[in-house]
Amino acid sequence: MTASTSSTPSTSTKIPSSSKSSVTKQTKQKRNERERKRVDQVNQGFVLLQERVPKAAGNKAKLSKVETLREAARYIQELQKQLGMSSTSFHNSMPADFPTPEQSPVYPQSVCSMMAQTPSPSYTSPYYPPPQMMSSNQHDMSSHYYQESSSSSASTSGDHHSFYSHTETY
């Protein structure tokens, strides 16, 4: 008895159903693993952000992701206010007098004390030489560059800072 074959050319190249399902299973497993890894990375990022954003004095509960983002936005706005930065001056100029973390009322005191106790690492790398003091000639050239770039960016600013200037009250 002879086996009947279909007249369509695709039947000769068909993958057996058992190997087809294993390919599909492997593909699904890989896709699921990538998604789990992505979700884990997002969650780790939120944990780090929650650790860095100061909480209100009475709020000891863990913040949700949305609350964490809102608090981070408020914290950034507060820091900008303390630095005297408006949305337009944020990119065009930097104030000369920055408050230290100890002077900041919103900066977590535990971090301040931890930073004071932790010695600065002495990092050396053959790829990145240590910073060197600028000569007065180099300083003059760099300050001239920044003056030109800030004036040119101010004249061509248009509306590309509108994302940063949009503030919402939460």
From Swiss-Prot:
UniProt region (Disordered), positions on chain: 1-42, 118-170
Pfam families, alphabetized: HLH
Positions of region (Basic motif): 26-39
Keywords: Apoptosis, Differentiation, DNA-binding, Neurogenesis, Nucleus, Serotonin biosynthesis, Transcription, Transcription regulation
Region feature Helix-loop-helix motif, mapped onto this chain: 40-79
Entry-linked InterPro entries: bHLH_dom, HLH_DNA-bd_sf, MASH1/Ascl1a-like
Keyword match GTP-binding: no
bHLH domain segment(s): 26-79
Tree of life domain: Eukaryota
Disulphide bonds in the chain: none
Sequence ranges of Basic and acidic residues compositional bias: 30-40
Tissue: Expressed in the ADL sensory neurons.
One GO cellular component, as annotated: nucleus
Biased composition (Low complexity): 1-26, 143-157
Cell location: Nucleus
Any GO MF annotation of the entry: DNA-binding transcription factor activity, RNA polymerase II-specific
Mutant phenotype after disruption: Egg-laying defective. Reduced expression of the tryptophan hydroxylase tph-1 which leads to reduced production of the neurotransmitter serotonin in the hermaphrodite-specific motor neurons (HSN). Inappropriate lateral projection of HSN axons. Lack of netrin receptor unc-40 expression in a subset of HSN and VC motor neurons. RNAi-mediated knockdown prevents cell death of a subset of the serotonergic neurosecretory motor (NSM) neuron sister cells, and survival of NSM sister cells is increased in an hlh-2 mutant background.
GO biological processes: apoptotic process; neuron differentiation; positive regulation of programmed cell death; positive regulation of transcription by RNA polymerase II; regulation of axon extension involved in axon guidance; regulation of egg-laying behavior; response to food; serotonin biosynthetic process
Function: Probable transcriptional regulator. May mediate transcriptional activation by binding to the E-box motif 5'-CANNTG-3'. Plays a role in the differentiation of the hermaphrodite-specific motor neurons (HSN) that are required for normal egg laying. Might play a role in serotonin production by regulating expression of the tryptophan hydrolase tph-1 which catalyzes serotonin synthesis, in the HSN neurons. Also plays a role in HSN axon guidance towards the vulva and the ventral nerve cord, possibly by promoting the expression of the netrin receptor unc-40.
Quaternary context: Efficient DNA binding requires dimerization with another bHLH protein. Forms a heterodimer with hlh-2.
Protein name: Helix-loop-helix protein 3
Species: Caenorhabditis elegans
High-level lineage: Eukaryota, Metazoa, Ecdysozoa, Nematoda, Chromadorea
